[in-house]
Amino acid sequence: MRGYFAASDEIAFRMAARGIPKNSVHVTGIPIMPVFAQHLDRKACAEELGIAPDRTTFLLMTGGAGIAGGETLIERLLGLPGDFQIVALAGKNQQLLANYRSLVARSGGRLFALGFTSAIERVMACADLAVTKPGGLTVSECLAVGLPMVLIAPIPGQEERNADYLMEQGAAVKAHDAVALEYKIARLVGEPERFARMRASMRGLGHPDAARAVLNHVLNDRR
């Protein structure tokens, strides 16, 4: 093996601790699509989605399979005071999309339910906070665009370690249930300085050009 690519400095350190030569490990981040390195216009993206560009926007991403109690999460969020909107993604799960849409009518124009999208970067460009499971790619995409996260339902193992890492870095908080989610988002919204620090931490940890970095290392190694 001529080289390795690591998602973070800590992973590179752990690889070295297992005997892998340090000079063969390159910290590039997880490769993601180049669109996440672009600066997208929030107003234009919001108009495409039919949402207000100037309202605080929570993006709920529970994965295509959804999570137990996703509708309860939305109902708790809708109970928060303030001028905000929720964009809830259901992926290709038609039943989940139908469940989310059943809540739209009584949301007072604050809930927008979407199915699968191939342009998630344009949805993220409209958001101020993501409520999501801490999967590797989702985390990498949020980091790249500087989107703070409230983490829910991590799978034991890798997702739990992802959550721990982000919380240690001040880039995310974790909610164990719907009540905790409501409480923590209310706290974040009421503390704009903390919100700003989280966004800065996200951008500092992000590797929007990870794919290019990997490619450059590979091509240079072949010369």
Provide a role label for each language-model segment.
Residues E168-G170, H176-E193:
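C-terminal "capping" alpha-helix adjacent to the active site of nucleotide-linked donor transferases
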Residues R194-P208:
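A short, well-ordered alpha-helix in the C-terminal region of glycosyltransferases
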Residues A125-G135:
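Acidic donor-binding loop of glycosyltransferase active sites
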Residues H207-R223:
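C-terminal alpha-helical cap of glycosyltransferases
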Residues M1-G64, K92-N93:
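A nucleotide-sugar donor-handling region in carbohydrate enzymes
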Residues A127-D128, G146-P148:
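A short alpha->beta transition loop at the rim of the catalytic pocket in nucleotide-sugar-dependent
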Residues E121, V139-V145, D164:
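Short alpha-helical segment that forms part of, or immediately flanks, the ligand-binding pocket
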